[in-house]
Amino acid sequence: MSTRWYPIYQRGNPQLRVFLPNFWMKLIRPTEEQPPNVVTFSVSMEMTKYDVRNYLEKIYKLPVVDVRTRIAMGETKKDQTYGYITKKDDVKLAYVTLPREESFVFPDFFSEKAEKQAKEEKSLDESKAGFRRFLDRNKKRPGTPGWFSI
């Protein structure tokens, strides 16, 4: 249930008002391998399973079969200098199961960047291999410069 109040009725037409709850949902990549019809959301702590289901069905028109929620404990960390312990906020995760016919795949926005990075890694590996061949050639004469070869 939202904590915001629905606007008061006012006489006359049109009734221009929109009720926006203070709920939020964030689509996240799952940490473990999941079936293609299961989608993981990070939701606000106040949301229940029924709120998640209604949110997706009414606003986004998604057919929802099942909703499971859990509260993931925030990460604790010890400060290296002073030794005090800090803890990140807990997060509520919702696992939404869609019908078997539907599947969700994260879009690959950075495929061009991955190709470019692979190309750069290939050229770096080639230069490393060339340098290694140079070192192997001069193994028997340590300390001599490269121009001093036969």
From Swiss-Prot:
Protein name: Large ribosomal subunit protein uL23m
InterPro entries xref list: Nucleotide-bd_a/b_plait_sf (IPR012677), Ribosomal_uL23-like (IPR013025), Ribosomal_uL23/eL15/eS24_sf (IPR012678)
GO molecular function, one term: structural constituent of ribosome
GO cellular component, one term: mitochondrial large ribosomal subunit
Biological processes per GO annotation: mitochondrial translation
Main location: mitochondrion
Alphabetical UniProt keywords: Mitochondrion, Ribonucleoprotein, Ribosomal protein
Record's subcellular location: Mitochondrion
Quaternary structure (record): Component of the mitochondrial ribosome large subunit (39S) which comprises a 16S rRNA and about 50 distinct proteins.
Gene name of the record: mRpL23
Species whose genome carries this gene: Drosophila melanogaster (Fruit fly)
Entry's family note: Belongs to the universal ribosomal protein uL23 family.
UniProt cross-references to Pfam families, sorted A to Z: Ribosomal_L23
Superkingdom of the source species: Eukaryota
